[in-house]
Amino acid sequence: MNRFATLLLALLVTSPLYAQALQVAKPDTIPDRPEKLVFSELDFTVPDGDTYRHQLPNGVVVYVAEDHTLPLVSLNVMLKVGSYLESAEQVGLAGLTGSLIRSGGTESLAPRDFDEQVEFLASSLSSSGEGTSASAGARSITPAVEESLALFFDMLRHPRFDLERLEVEKSNAIEAMRQRNDDADAILGREWSWLLYGHDYYASRRMTKNNLDGINREDLRAFHAKYWRPENMIVSVSGDVETDAILASLERGFADWPGSGASNRWPPPGPTHVVVPGVYHVEKDIPQGKVLIGHLVPQWTDWSNPDRAALQVMDHILGGSGFTSRIMKRVRSDEGLAYSAGSDFSFDSFQPGTFTVSFQSKNETVALAAKISLEEVRRTQEELVGDEELEVAKGSLIQSFPRRFDSAGQIASTFAYDTFIGRSHDYWQRWREQVGDVTADDVRRVAQRYLKPDEVVLLLVGKWDEIAKGDPEGRASMNNFFGGKVIHLPLRDPLTLEPLAGK
């Protein structure tokens, strides 16, 4: 057990809160029937995001949420940096840069020495790079905050990008590539992103060995120097801090690190690929076919649009609420075709989002499960949902809403993300009212407007001979979709992503 875990355990064991949690309820206070349980009325006030917002002299926005329950502090830096800034020849550069900032040491400390100092402080530091964002984080016990921040800013500002650690990262990446075709879900996700966004879009590009071989230490240094800059950063801090004190510490950390004034093409560009609806298949000898059905939905930038609340209620009813959703009830509970089935209406601020139905089923029942799922999509467009179904969905969403602000960390990170995507903090003040105002007519209206069951991409990974025939009772086959036409996609070389011969 490392020092951080040991100290945390000691704090928990001696905490009055922990002791209270261990107290056993008296038997006479426990009702003998579930329906006799009495709950206090939910009284929750949404925090005011502006009260947590601060700005450093160099322009960096910081959100601070104090919580003195335990002597722990968390800090996260979110950056408007990601793989959308890579060239097509250097796919993976943003991710490698993000990873090596933490693992590759600093100019003054070799990786092992840096790791030892972090461990000695019982701290945890991290960094990463993704599609439209990068991040760096620190966790520390309160007595070690200043020393941890010193290491954190050394890492953030002066990464070494150690050559040996870079080779380790590359070796790990190649090993991960070699396993790409072992997992049907990985194949499904890869082909799905290409079908919806195209091969050349940053969000769907996949790193190859050639890409990896073409990235060197100087590329990482250049990417960091150009984009990991204060003007691209938003900071959130939570835990056992005094706001004025932590702001002063951050100001010192950012001292002498001015913004470059260079643009990083924010927001990221949208895709130009034209989606072609139809049935697509990748052959793989597995007992259960993996299935995704769906289409793109509009990019979401108008956060005041009440359609968002109606769509969340609609998706909750259709397939987003687990065992209570329509798709799950029919596909699993009624027909026993899958362990899990559902839908997801995904909102994205930087590119078109997706509406997706997903499940896995025996190869011979894939067609029937797909047919039933699309029937439920159409039913949501054609019929008004029932009053009870509507109220349960709205109640579930509203009752779970306070969990978004359960902790100081969630408060700070939620409001920081608002700033990241350009969403007003007032959005949260209006959200519950908007959900509560959703009617059955609203659910049907947004289903008709945003769902396109006749224009879906239906992607399958599995044994085509079994999938095509359909279920033994003849209730559905792949002839039910797009006139029986199918495009067979090749299995790809895991290192080059070129089609494998004969596959």
Feature names for model-found ranges:
Residues 83, 292-296, 319-361, 414:
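A structural supersecondary motif
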Residues 22-32, 37, 199, 234-301, ...:
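An aromatic/glycine/proline-enriched structural segment found at the starts
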Residues 74-139, 182, 202-206, 321-337, ...:
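M16/MPP (pitrilysin/insulinase) zinc-metallopeptidase core fold and M16-derived inactive scaffolds
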Residues 38-76:
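Mature N-terminal segment immediately following signal peptide/propeptide cleavage
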